Amino acid sequence: MGAAAAEADRTLFVGNLETKVTEELLFELFHQAGPVIKVKIPKDKDGKLKQFAFVNFKHEVSVPYAMNLLNGIKLFGRPIKIQFRSGSSHASQDASVSYPQHHVGNLSPTSTSPNSYERTVGNVSPTAQMVQRSFSSPEDYQRQAVMNSVFRQMSYAGKFGSPHADQLGFSPSAQPHGHTFNQSSSSQWRQDALSSQRKRQNSHPYLADRHYSREQRYSDHGSDYHYRGSREDFYYDDRNHDGWSHDYDNRRDSSRGGKWPSSRH
């Protein structure tokens, strides 16, 4: 297999894009299916972005997985249409392999119209139908996890000046309400655990002055002091150090050869 054929096998064609869709947004979306090397939206002779893109994955196995997971997801109200790239060995299998479309509610599984795609990234509204619907299969949970992950990543981007997060129209209330987080009970649990831990430490003759939990070490600094060495800080440092990049090897694997970025205290 030649290099060109191998690259075609690792590439997807993504069509029916809304004009506001960017390479950055597609990168974040398709990265949920596997490591992405680059995303390219071609331009016409006038310099305007065309309504399709090519997504090149690092691993060939990510291609059919992304096709199955993301085909038909709406970006800014328009469902994307994913196809194998011309020349790909997967294209010959496309006619014989049926990739199931994902539907919600009472939609007919045989419907192929764009309106049948209910999995959305843009313009999510907290309707009663969305909030009350039940997830009937592990695939539904997986798709919801993809949407939540993209929402979190684009929220980080919007927090630091990217215009894409606000335009997407995400609503946290569109996430499934079957799993609720009780903040008061969690806070009480942490207080009880901390109290128990202090009792154990005070009873040990060698740990009284040396070992403290993270909560104890930073509680003395007052409520305005925040622990900065969290994974979110590492995520932000990695994602925003040099701005947006479509090079997976330089952007995603750089931390493997070295150590975690040091915390800025």
Curated annotation (Swiss-Prot):
The modification Omega-N-methylarginine is found at R152. Keywords: Acetylation, Meiosis, Methylation, Nucleus, Phosphoprotein, RNA-binding. Phosphorylated at Ser-136 by MAPK14/p38-alpha-activated MAPKAPK2/MK2; this phosphorylation is stress-dependent; this phosphorylation decreases its RNA-binding capacity therefore affecting RNA nuclear exosome-mediated degradation. This phosphorylation mediates YWHAE and YWHAZ interactions. Residues 25-35, 59-76 are annotated as: ZCCHC8 binding. It is found in: Nucleus, Nucleoplasm; Nucleus. The modification N-acetylglycine is found at G2. GO terms for biological process: meiotic cell cycle. Residues 10-87 form the RRM domain. RNA-binding subunit of the trimeric nuclear exosome targeting (NEXT) complex, a complex that functions as an RNA exosome cofactor that directs a subset of non-coding short-lived RNAs for exosomal degradation. NEXT is involved in surveillance and turnover of aberrant transcripts and non-coding RNAs. Binds preferentially polyuridine sequences and associates with newly synthesized RNAs, including pre-mRNAs and short-lived exosome substrates such as promoter upstream transcripts (PROMPTs), enhancer RNAs (eRNAs), and 3'-extended products from small nuclear RNAs (snRNAs). Component of the nuclear exosome targeting (NEXT) complex composed of MTREX, ZCCHC8, and RBM7 that directs a subset of non-coding short-lived RNAs for exosomal degradation. Interacts with ZCCHC8 and SF3B2/SAP145. Binds to MTREX through ZCCHC8. Interacts with YWHAE and YWHAZ; these interactions are stress-dependent and RBM7 phosphorylation dependent; release RNA from the NEXT complex and may affect RNA targeting to the nuclear RNA exosomome for degradation. This is RNA-binding protein 7. It comes from Mus musculus (Mouse).
